[in-house]
Amino acid sequence: MIDLRLPLTDIHRHLDGNIRAQSILELGRQYNIALPASDLDALRPHVQVTKNEPDLLSFLQKLDWGVAVLGSLDACRRVAYENVEDAMNAGLDYAELRFSPYYMAMNHKLPIAGVVEAVIDGITAGSRDFDTDIRLIGIMSRTFGTEACQQELDALLSQRDRIVALDLAGDELGYPGAQFTSHFQQARDAGWHITVHAGEAAGPESIWQAINHLGAERIGHGVTAIIDPRLMTHMAETGIGIESCLTSNIQTSTVETLDKHPLIHFLRYGIPATINTDDPAVQGIEIRHEYEVAAPLAGLTAVETRKAQENGLNIAFISEQEKQQLREKVLRKRASA
């Protein structure tokens, strides 16, 4: 269960994986983009997981219709704004929204730097209108290769003060982290935090690469860390967090069933592991489902669930002062409710 005395966070949440089905329908009509269906009920199976996918790449294809309708920078601005509203409606006090500007730009050849600016504008407007603290993480989509990732990184660096971290996502098996060492050096030189998708489709060696070569402070998913006790000890001792996404890992067939998910073992090992959504619109879930349905099915006790909730703020990419201010704000808000 969610502890209402603590800030509720989601620190692994893809902005471009949370584009509403209704918005896909409306933007498709606005930009004359042929969609696989013309009404919401018929469209939903094409843009939302209805059964577990055979692998990560099959799951990621569900995201493609969301970015296919981004026919202008205004469309990018709109979906960013709606992401903040969705975070508020989900009851989140703090969220780190991550996005790949190259992925969002590519269908309609939008300027990548313009996409970054549009997302920032949408987040700024949403943060003004909705009472949720939002930070942005830039993603490099490794699937498109190192050169495309450099273009993406350059666009993100042009707004370096509005981005808190860099991530690497996409085809983990085909594009290992070691190919991106120079990219992450640039990010660290800019003062950004580092999180990396690793140990989702590949083994623990991918997590070691993310830590040793890319400077990862947090690992997205990280499920295969469970087969390397030395890695788990290292993560526990150094405070490298795991951004667990329970339902997502089932839907991508990364983990067979929730009762086999390693999150409970990560927590008991002392790794600062957290509970997150991943791509809520595509998955058809929200953060409350992860706490109230998925976490108990994964074997977490109330104490362990609370620890994961605490970890969500403890390893967030904000200062200790900002964390304390958020804790105090939440207590005031709950007291006046």
From Swiss-Prot:
The keyword Ribosomal protein does not apply. Its cofactor is Zn(2+). Keywords: Hydrolase, Metal-binding, Nucleotide metabolism, Zinc. The record marks 221 as: Important for catalytic activity. GO terms for biological process: adenosine catabolic process; hypoxanthine salvage; inosine biosynthetic process; nucleotide metabolic process; purine ribonucleoside monophosphate biosynthetic process. It catalyses: adenosine + H2O + H(+) = inosine + NH4(+); 2'-deoxyadenosine + H2O + H(+) = 2'-deoxyinosine + NH4(+). Pfam families: A_deaminase (PF00962). Substrate binds at residues 14, 16, 170, 279. One of its GO terms (molecular function) is adenosine deaminase activity. It is an enzyme of class 3 (hydrolase). HAMAP family: A_deaminase. Catalyzes the hydrolytic deamination of adenosine and 2-deoxyadenosine. Belongs to the metallo-dependent hydrolases superfamily. Adenosine and AMP deaminases family. Adenosine deaminase subfamily. PANTHER family: ADENOSINE DEAMINASE (PTHR11409:SF43). This is Adenosine deaminase. It comes from Pectobacterium atrosepticum (strain SCRI 1043 / ATCC BAA-672).
